[in-house]
């Protein structure tokens, strides 16, 4: 009876509790490679907003959040160029609305456990726009989109 109770408890923990709890962001490694576009407090705010957003990845762990100013600028320019011929995306709309100098890209590494399976999302991107006066802003940043 004790073995069955322990097995049930372990199963409930692994298959019910873990998948439903908010993502663990407490051990995320933060890496910043900035060039002056945003000040330290703005970048810190973007990271905090991103970690708060990533908590919705129930049952996962955020391993790393990275900001690289050059990579962010390259991806923004590429997005602008791809949509310049008449296309549109959430990122290009944010560039039009907030200005290219107010949009940031963060890269995230996330590990998830689904039952007995582990998976990882390395390089998962998050896009934010700096608009501290907005009621929608968290730490001064408005979430725009996420993905690869």
Question: Predicted regions span which residues?
Answer:
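Short beta-strand edge/turn micro-motifs at domain boundaries
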Residues: 121-148
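Hydrophobic H-region at the start of alpha-helical membrane spans
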Residues: 1-5
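Flexible low-complexity loop/turn motifs enriched in small/helix-breaking residues
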Residues: 8-120
């Amino acid at each position: 009876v004790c073995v069955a109770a322990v097995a049930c408890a372990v199963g409930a923990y692994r298959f019910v509790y873990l998948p439903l709890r908010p993502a663990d962001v407490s051990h995320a490694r933060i890496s910043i490679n900035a060039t002056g576009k945003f000040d330290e407090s703005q970048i810190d705010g973007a990271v905090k907003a991103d970690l708060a957003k990533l908590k919705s990845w129930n049952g996962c762990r955020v391993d790393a959040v990275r900001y690289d100013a050059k990579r962010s600028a390259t991806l923004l320019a590429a997005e602008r160029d791809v949509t310049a011929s008449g296309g549109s995306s959430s990122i290009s709309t944010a560039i039009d609305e907030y200005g290219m100098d107010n949009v940031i890209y963060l890269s995230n590494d996330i590990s998830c456990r689904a039952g007995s399976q582990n998976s990882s999302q390395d390089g998962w991107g998050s896009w934010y726009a700096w608009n501290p006066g907005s009621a929608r802003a968290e730490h001064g940043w408005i979430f725009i989109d996420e993905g690869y």
